[in-house]
Amino acid sequence: MAAEEKDPLSYFAAYGSSSSSDSESSDEEKETENAKNRAAKRPFPTEAKKLPGPDELFRSVSRPAFLYNPLNKQIDWESRVKRAPEEPAKEFKIWKTNAVPPPESYQVAEKKAPPPELDMAIKWSNVYQDNGDDAPHANQAKCLPEEEAQEDSPPSDDEQEKAFATKKRKV
């Protein structure tokens, strides 16, 4: 039996030898038969310990040793439970966003009115320094002709004196 249980790699070592082909075929047949017999006799290696079967295991062990309490025969599962620490309630913080606020909280920012600008004709005239007689000038707009404007407004004392002085000069 010791001859049969030689090194399992010897099969491959004999395969590469340079002996005659007849002896190789007979050696190969013997090796394959021996390998089949060995496989049928030992399905698992004998060197490793076998695990006990389920029936045998449950007959010998009823519960783990760390749970055994000789004073109380029942297992206190509540004392074994591990709970996560409770987190404190989170405070609500308003997120800072660039989003448009809802309509009820939206207040239109009042913008200042743009400064009164010059007429573009006057502005361009100043840019190009076109200050001739026909250049536009910034004067008060006149809606009524001069004659009607004088009739509507009562003449002041200064205007009456000037008008009287001009009449005297003309004569």
Swiss-Prot record:
Acidic residues bias: start-end ranges: 146-160
Chain intervals with Basic and acidic residues compositional bias: 47-56
InterPro entries: DUF4660
Region (Disordered): 1-56, 126-171
Pfam families, A to Z: DUF4660 (PF15559)
Protein family: Belongs to the UPF0690 family.
The protein, known as: UPF0690 protein C1orf52 homolog A
Source organism of the structure: Xenopus laevis (African clawed frog)
Taxonomic placement: Eukaryota, Metazoa, Chordata, Craniata, Vertebrata
